[in-house]
Amino acid sequence: MAEERFPGWHGTTILAVRRGGEVVVAGDGQVSLGQTVIKGTARKVRRLSPGGHEVVAGFAGSTADAFTLLERLEKKLEAAPGQLARACVELAKDWRMDKYLRNLEAMLIVTDGETLLVLTGAGDVLEPEHDVTAIGSGGNFALAAARGLMATELPAEEIARKAMAIAADICVYTNGNLTVERISK
């Protein structure tokens, strides 16, 4: 999506792993323009606390668009405290139907430590089947690595870090400078 309006912008891998009563969300810090790394320390994973209920969100795509969506999500969560799935469905409906929001180019992974969801501009609110999900340019690499590591006894954070390291080794738009947030219910 972002490549249509901004053909040279690339970057971001966000991965979420749910295991042992917690969810870990990890994101790399690289932002690239064409073949140039513009920034290596961007924070694409955020902790939100609307109405005192903690949520962790990671985003891929346009940063400004993602922040707009995160602000909207916070408002939806304030209107439906502790109901992450409901708030995400309401946001997805707005995102799909509102003329302004429809043009936003970002994807989100959100979790409250129990529920884990991916939100897309197509109106999708998806819950992963295997307690692992990923978005962004290196998302498929991180997802494959994490799915393989889920067969081990490693804790969620270690799975996330190892999978992100593998993605960073393969995807030129992903680096090893991670932001990692943990949340449990």
Curated annotation (Swiss-Prot):
Keywords associated with the record: Allosteric enzyme, Cytoplasm, Hydrolase, Metal-binding, Protease, Sodium, Threonine protease
Cellular component, GO, one term: proteasome core complex
InterPro entries for the chain = ATP-dep_Prtase_HsIV_su, Ntn_hydrolases_N, Proteasome_sua/b, Proteasome_suB-type
Gene3D superfamilies noted in UniProt: Glutamine Phosphoribosylpyrophosphate, subunit 1, domain 1 (3.60.20.10)
Q: Which EC numbers does the record give?
A: 3.4.25.2
UniProt superkingdom: Bacteria
Which residues does the Swiss-Prot or TrEMBL record annotate as the active site? 12
Q: Where does Na(+) bind?
A: 168, 171, 174
Q: Name one Pfam family in it.
A: Proteasome
Q: Where in the cell is the protein located?
A: Cytoplasm
Single GO molecular function: metal ion binding
**Would I find Isomerase among this entry's keywords?**
no
- Name the PROSITE patterns on file: PROTEASOME_BETA_2 (PS51476)
Q: Name one GO biological process term.
A: proteolysis involved in protein catabolic process
What chemistry does it catalyse, as a reaction equation? ATP-dependent cleavage of peptide bonds with broad specificity
Q: How is its activity regulated?
A: Allosterically activated by HslU binding.
- The answer to whether UniProt assigns keyword NAD to this entry is no
Q: Which family does it belong to?
A: Belongs to the peptidase T1B family. HslV subfamily.
State its role.
Protease subunit of a proteasome-like degradation complex believed to be a general protein degrading machinery.
**Entry's PANTHER family?**
ATP-DEPENDENT PROTEASE SUBUNIT HSLV, METALLOPROTEASE TLDD
Self-association state and partner proteins as the record states:
A double ring-shaped homohexamer of HslV is capped on each side by a ring-shaped HslU homohexamer. The assembly of the HslU/HslV complex is dependent on binding of ATP.
Name recorded for this polypeptide:
ATP-dependent protease subunit HslV
Q: Which gene encodes it?
A: hslV
